[in-house]
Amino acid sequence: MNKKKNAPVRKIIADNRKARFNYEILDNLEAGLVLQGAEVKSLRSNHANIAESYASFENGELWLVNSYIPEYTQANRFNHEPRRLRKLLISKREMARFFNATSREGMTLVPLKLYFNERGRAKLEIALARGKKLHDKRETEKKRDWGREKARLLKRYG
């Protein structure tokens, strides 16, 4: 008999839930990260914060700015700077496409998830996004509340 293949295991380290509320997500992309050894060990112990971070282009390269990976406690002298710039690895075609998109006004690159893929590599899901206005945020909240209320009513009255 054929065995069913399970979905790939992705161990999520950090999730930027605030980004989906503050930004309108237009396009997603998976990028690799250039990390030091102590950073990987710190990530494996689920310590990271990408809530206030963003991606920017400098000298034709894509960098993750203001992400926080704390120092690994057992790595005494080989530790890293917790808020250092981290290079993101994407193809040249994707880099050109995202560079052209972010050069338009109001567009930015925000990280959504930081995770280990099925091969054990640290990956970052980044999104091309446009900032929401206050009325857009209120509309999103109303839709979410109505969805919850609708589910409650369906559960109650079948």
From Swiss-Prot:
GO molecular function terms noted in the UniProt entry: RNA binding
InterPro entries per record: SmpB, SsrA-bd_prot, SsrA-bd_prot_CS
Keyword Protein transport attached: no
Gene3D superfamilies, sorted: 2.40.280.10
PROSITE patterns for this protein: SSRP
Coiled-coil residue windows: none
One GO BP annotation of this record: trans-translation
Pfam families cross-referenced by the UniProt entry: SmpB
Keywords assigned by UniProt, alphabetized: Cytoplasm, RNA-binding
Top-rank lineage group of the source organism: Bacteria
Transmembrane feature ranges: none
Protein location: Cytoplasm
One GO cellular component term noted in the UniProt record for this chain: cytosol
Its biological purpose: Required for rescue of stalled ribosomes mediated by trans-translation. Binds to transfer-messenger RNA (tmRNA), required for stable association of tmRNA with ribosomes. tmRNA and SmpB together mimic tRNA shape, replacing the anticodon stem-loop with SmpB. tmRNA is encoded by the ssrA gene; the 2 termini fold to resemble tRNA(Ala) and it encodes a 'tag peptide', a short internal open reading frame. During trans-translation Ala-aminoacylated tmRNA acts like a tRNA, entering the A-site of stalled ribosomes, displacing the stalled mRNA.
Family of this protein: Belongs to the SmpB family.
PANTHER family: SSRA-BINDING PROTEIN (PTHR30308:SF2), TMRNA-BINDING COMPONENT OF TRANS-TRANSLATION TAGGING COMPLEX (PTHR30308)
Protein name in UniProt: SsrA-binding protein
Provenance organism: Bartonella henselae (strain ATCC 49882 / DSM 28221 / CCUG 30454 / Houston 1)
Lineage: Bacteria, Pseudomonadati, Pseudomonadota, Alphaproteobacteria, Hyphomicrobiales
